[in-house]
């Protein structure tokens, strides 16, 4: 039965360590000493209360002088009286003071709130074409993005800046191979993502030589506002080729060609992206360009952009499907190479012939086993006969010896 502290506003119980990692011990009331019991109850401010023999007080209510430590065990002195008791006000103060873990959790929540507060939707009402420029400052390269759009209704601007590769990995923005994702958004959204100093080696389909640079991509989710151009130094890009699949979805094709200082280039094709406008969820899509040098010819990298909330499930499902497919393929190769009867060139008749031969061999082995068992039994019978004959010969020898001994005794006499 667990032990509880009988003092009011005290929540200590047996098997539970204190807040400062101190061990608790419990002591019974001095029911046999009435004067001392009255002092205990008076200090507890419960004069009219009569405790039972099963009720205890914890060590937090006693001063260190009233405890006697022997062999690591704390014993209560016979004259000890509890003097430390908390009032309701102290209890409220104590509850208001959070533990370090709770403080850390609050700090983390505050940081997340601050990060979310930076992503405040800004409504813009524009009826005329407008040019918005975004410059990526770099000592070697400068990029200017000029977007001319006609906005007839309010837009939500959401910006997310990835400063280094760690932030790129922490935010879990994944480029998946040739897959179409359905992203639900209630309103058209203008999204801008800036990538700074991201090496091309982080992308699986990139070229071996790492080249770091800065790029900025603007993407529109509504087909009415997609007539925009992206211009970089020594680069050309466009956001075009948009079609409508159904009244509620839009397909966006985005191709960007990035040329570094050399003549080599990497062509990044953001293949297809389906955006469905529904009132249920609000998910952000971020387009990221990672250029790299190509040794011989420009390479084509096909990617589609995943929503942040669905990327983990999609990548895990793709990995499991790939692993299952590879395991099945390897199993077929092993069967076809190691076991001849699994080859597809062999006919059924040939297999049946092999099966009949195996059955005949099994019958021969069974007959040989019967013969060997019979031989073993005959040998066991012969061994038994020899043992009996040996016993008889030993008995005869004993009789002859006894006769000689009796003759010798008679001769001596």
Swiss-Prot record:
By its UniProt entry, which InterPro entries does this protein fall under? THAP_domain_protein, THAP_Znf
Task: Map the zinc fingers (THAP-type) to residue ranges.
Answer: 1-85
Main subcellular location: nucleus
What GO CC annotations are associated with the protein? Answer: nucleus
Superkingdom of source: Eukaryota
- Residue ranges that the Swiss-Prot or TrEMBL entry lists as coiled coil: 375-399
The record ties this protein, via SUPFAM superfamilies, to:
Glucocorticoid receptor-like (DNA-binding domain)
Q: Which cysteines are joined by disulfide bonds?
A: none
The entry lists its GO molecular-function terms as: DNA binding; zinc ion binding
Which segments show compositional bias classed as Basic and acidic residues?
102-118
Keyword list, A-Z: Coiled coil, DNA-binding, Metal-binding, Nucleus, Zinc, Zinc-finger
Which residue ranges are recorded for the region named Disordered? 84-118
The places in or outside the cell where this protein is found are: Nucleus
PROSITE patterns to which the protein is assigned, alphabetical:
ZF_THAP
Q: What name does the UniProt record give this protein?
A: THAP domain-containing protein 5
Provide the species name.
Answer: Gallus gallus
């Amino acid at each position: 039965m667990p032990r509880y502290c009988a003092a009011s506003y005290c929540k200590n119980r047996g098997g539970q360590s204190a807040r400062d990692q101190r061990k608790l011990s419990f002591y019974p009331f001095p029911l046999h000493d009435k004067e001392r019991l009255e002092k205990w109850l008076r200090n507890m401010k419960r004069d009219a209360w009569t405790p039972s023999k099963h009720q205890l007080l914890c060590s937090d209510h006693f001063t260190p002088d009233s405890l006697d430590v022997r062999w690591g065990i704390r014993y209560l002195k016979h004259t000890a009286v509890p003097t430390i008791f908390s009032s309701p006000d102290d209890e409220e103060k104590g509850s208001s003071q959070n533990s370090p873990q709770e403080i850390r959790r609050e700090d983390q929540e505050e940081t997340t709130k601050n990060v979310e507060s930076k992503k405040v939707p800004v409504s813009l009402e524009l009826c005329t074409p407008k040019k918005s420029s975004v410059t990526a400052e770099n000592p070697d390269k400068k990029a200017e993005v000029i977007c001319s759009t006609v906005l007839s209704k309010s837009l939500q601007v959401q910006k997310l800046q990835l400063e280094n590769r760690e932030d790129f990995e922490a935010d879990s923005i994944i480029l998946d191979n040739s897959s179409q994702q359905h992203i639900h958004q209630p309103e058209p959204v203008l999204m801008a993502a800036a990538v700074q100093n991201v090496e091309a080696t982080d992308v699986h389909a990139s070229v071996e030589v790492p080249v770091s640079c800065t790029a900025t991509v603007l993407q529109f989710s509504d087909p009415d506002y997609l007539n925009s151009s992206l211009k970089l130094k020594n680069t050309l890009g466009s956001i075009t080729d948009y079609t409508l699949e159904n009244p509620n979805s839009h397909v966006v094709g985005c191709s960007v060609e990035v040329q570094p200082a050399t003549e080599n280039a990497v062509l990044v094709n953001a293949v297809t992206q389906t955006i469905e406008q529904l009132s249920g969820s609000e998910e952000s899509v971020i387009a990221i360009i990672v250029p790299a040098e190509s040794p011989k010819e420009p390479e084509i990298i096909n990617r589609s952009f995943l929503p942040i909330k669905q990327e983990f499930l999609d990548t895990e499902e793709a990995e499991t499907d790939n692993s299952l497919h590879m395991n099945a393929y390897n199993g077929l190769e092993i069967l076809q190479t190691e076991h001849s009867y699994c080859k597809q060139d062999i006919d059924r008749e040939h297999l049946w012939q092999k099966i009949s031969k195996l059955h005949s061999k099994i019958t021969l082995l069974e007959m040989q086993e019967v013969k060997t068992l019979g031989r073993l039994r005959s040998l066991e019978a012969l061994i038994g006969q020899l043992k009996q004959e040996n016993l008889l010969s030993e008995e005869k020898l004993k009789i002859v010896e006894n006769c000689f001994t009796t003759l010798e005794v008679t001769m001596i006499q």
